[in-house]
From Swiss-Prot:
Protein localization: Endoplasmic reticulum membrane; Microsome membrane
Cofactors that this protein relies on: heme
Main location: endoplasmic reticulum
Group of enzyme by EC: oxidoreductase
Protein name, per record: Probable cytochrome P450 310a1
Keywords: Endoplasmic reticulum, Heme, Iron, Membrane, Metal-binding, Microsome, Monooxygenase, Oxidoreductase
Origin species: Drosophila melanogaster
Binding residues for heme: 428
Keyword Transcription regulation attached: no
CDD domains linked to this entry: CYP6-like (cd11056)
Family from the record: Belongs to the cytochrome P450 family.
Length: 492
């Protein structure tokens, strides 16, 4: 009798797993060959712990526009065609979303981000530009001070840019007037090492995680909000607009002062406001730092590109060392370089969405059932020769814009292949803010320093997506800095 129990248990598990691994075949979708074999279980392991690389391998394994795959015991539908991905994510009318109901009652995260999108309009960004530029100056002062103290000229620029990103977040999202290059023991500086040591499992890493950092970051938000609501502090930053939204005030327009309402009527509790801020912290930290890092990695191998960028930057007025917001849009060649960086090293390598109600694919017999996961592998698409010639070569001029051309890609007929900041409901609402922060860092570094890469480092440099999905260089990026002679008024 007792011998039957393990046999029955094993049989139940075996049949259950086999049923899961036959999901796409039973529904008639093109799918990979799945089974309880050692080779397939290795694939499942790789998709769990080396998620990005394994999904890219699945993208390259066939020619079907759709492919049913399995991430551990989770059926996932992989989209391998750009036009189909755009159709699904742009025209599916709410069939797909990123998360369950969150933040505030009556809002999905998708809709909440739509409400907050006006915070990142041109008018608002121009008024926040002074704060961004001040943080950029902190970065340059720190690097100049290291040289002045006789320290080695070689620095890990990736780590410095992560601190720069944290400073941006601290000053504009958490409302703190702080320079983390000087306050190395601050909680937001400590968060850098905490985020790098997060869970490596892709599935487990998405589960709600509470740590002492969550509560300490919430305390920062609580203190900053109290200063604004109870003491009338007005500061032109993102937090000020979040607090306006919390009080039911418009975030568009040109008003910064609060019109407080009763606590019972507030749209966001402190807890949920802190969750919004922490999510912005997680996304912005790696997106900004990685984009600037990989731009430097590529352009420093091409002196002609650096020369063109410096010539473009030289045309900026730069009065008393200060940039003008309205002039940054005229940096066309820098825009091309950033697009090429985002193509080759997208901060969001995979878009993952959950079907919230059954969706019939256009011009197809297939239907995606509610609850099933859809993946769009941006990294693999951006490096596909079908869409971009010489995909591993850094070619900013592939995005050259002309008067009669939208300027997506010069060497292919596909006009909408580039998806640098997402697509449809997954598009980053803060992309204009991110571009602004990235441009300020690049301009100030190229203005103030001659930068040089070690050729041997470039040969051995490894790009990593661990923890998934963020992209970074595994061992940092060492760059030799030499101060450039510029206008003495720049730092008077």
């Amino acid at each position: 009798m007792w011998l039957l129990l393990p046999i029955l248990l094993y049989s139940a598990v075996f049949l259950s797993v086999r049923h899961i691994y036959s999901h796409w075949r039973r529904r008639g979708f093109p799918s990979e060959k799945a089974g309880i074999t050692w080779s397939f279980l290795q694939k499942a392991y790789r998709r769990e712990f080396r998620h990005v690389e394994a999904i890219c391998e699945a993208y390259q394994s066939g020619k079907d526009r759709l492919l049913g795959i399995y991430c551990f015991f989770r059926p996932v539908l992989l989209v391998r065609n750009v036009e189909l991905a755009q159709t699904i994510l742009q025209q599916s009318n709410g069939h797909f979303s990123e998360l369950k109901w969150d933040y505030i009652s009556g809002y999905r995260r998708f809709n909440l981000l739509e409400k907050l999108a006006p915070m990142f309009g041109t008018k608002r960004l121009s008024e926040m530009f002074g704060q961004v530029q001040k943080v950029g100056d902190h970065l340059i002062h720190h690097l100049l001070d290291r040289q002045g103290q006789g320290c080695p000229q070689e620095v890990d620029i990736q780590q410095k840019l992560r601190v720069y990103s944290v400073n941006i977040i601290a000053n504009l999202i958490y409302g703190l007037d702080i320079n983390n290059f000087e306050h190395e023991d601050h909680i937001l500086t400590s968060y850098l090492s905490h985020s790098q040591a997060s869970i490596q499992s892709f599935t487990l890493g998405r589960l709600p995680q509470k740590s002492s950092y969550t509560y300490r970051l919430r305390d920062l938000i609580k203190q900053s909000v109290e200063l604004r609501e109870d003491h009338g502090l007005i500061r032109k930053d993102i937090l000020q607009l979040l607090v306006r939204f919390r009080n039911g005030n418009e975030v568009s327009g040109d008003k910064w002062q609060l019109e407080p309402i009763n606590d019972a009527d507030k749209l966001l509790s402190i807890k949920r406001l802190a969750k919004v801020a922490e999510d912005l912290l997680k996304v912005s930290l790696d997106a900004v730092a990685s984009t600037v890092t990989f731009t430097l990695l590529e352009i420093l191998q091409e002196p002609l590109i650096v020369e063109k960028l410096r010539a473009e930057i030289k045309e900026l007025s730069n009065e008393n060392g200060q940039l003008k917001f309205e002039e940054l849009n005229g940096l066309r060649y820098m825009d091309m370089c950033l697009k090429e960086t985002l193509r080759k090293y997208p901060p969001l390598p995979i878009i993952e969405r959950v079907c919230r109600k059954s969706y019939s694919l256009p011009n197809s017999k297939f239907t995606i059932d509610e609850g099933k996961t859809l993946m769009v592998p941006l990294l693999a698409m951006h490096r596909d020769e079908k869409y971009f010639s010489e995909p591993m070569k850094y070619k900013p001029l592939r995005f050259l814009q002309t008067a009669n051309d939208v300027g997506q890609c010069e060497d292919k007929t596909k006009s909408n292949v580039f998806i640098g900041f997402g697509i449809g409901g997954s598009q980053c609402v803060g992309q204009n803010f991110a571009k602004l922060v990235i441009k300020v860092a690049l301009i100030k570094l190229l203005q103030n320093f001659h930068l040089e890469l070690d050729a041997n480092q470039v040969k051995t440099l490894k790009v990593s997506h661990r923890p998934a999905p963020f992209i970074h260089t595994k061992d940092g990026l060492k760059v030799k800095l030499k101060r450039r002679e510029i206008n003495t008024k720049f730092y008077s």
